[in-house]
């Protein structure tokens, strides 16, 4: 659904800030869903040697997000990004917001942006 807000989060099992960001969002995810209709897709950029670790990590974390694997990093290259975590908000096929890195509290700003772009 192109009109639905989508958060795309590029991450990897070896990226500590990535895991922290997805854990932080997980803590507030249900509250966010009560206020805003959005989808979160976490795209693992783990390569073919480590993608099994991504699946195991996701199963252990029980993240409610849709998880995709970008084993060849084609999607990451198409976005033109070299760094993770990379978080984007997309609506109607357009990137409305993009952020690289994670500091505790960044998820609050992400929620503000979701609220801003909701309408």
PLM features: what roles do these ranges have?
Residues 1-19, 25:
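Short active-site neighborhood of thiol/selenol oxidoreductases, capturing the structured segment around
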Residues 2-6, 38, 85:
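Alpha/beta-hydrolase fold active-site loops
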Residues 3, 26, 31, 109-119:
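Proteins that catalyze or organize thiol-disulfide redox chemistry
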Residues 9-11, 42-44, 89:
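Structural cue for short, hydrophobic secondary-structure segments
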Residues 17, 23-27, 66, 85:
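Proline-centered helix-kink/hinge sites
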Residues 20-61, 72-77:
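Structural microenvironment flanking redox-active thiols in thiol-disulfide oxidoreductases
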Residues 56-63, 71-115:
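Thiol/disulfide oxidoreductase modules built on the thioredoxin-like
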């Amino acid at each position: 659904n192109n009109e639905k807000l989508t958060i795309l989060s590029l991450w990897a099992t070896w990226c500590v800030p990535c895991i922290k960001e997805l854990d932080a969002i997980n803590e507030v995810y249900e509250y966010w869903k009560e206020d805003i209709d959005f989808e979160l897709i976490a795209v693992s950029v783990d390569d073919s040697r480590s993608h099994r670790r991504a699946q195991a990590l996701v199963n252990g974390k029980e993240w409610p997000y849709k998880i995709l694997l970008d084993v060849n990093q084609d999607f990451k290259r198409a976005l033109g990004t070299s760094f993770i975590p990379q978080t984007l908000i997309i609506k109607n096929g357009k990137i409305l917001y993009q952020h690289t890195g994670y500091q505790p509290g960044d998820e609050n700003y992400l929620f503000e942006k979701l609220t801003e772009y909701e309408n």
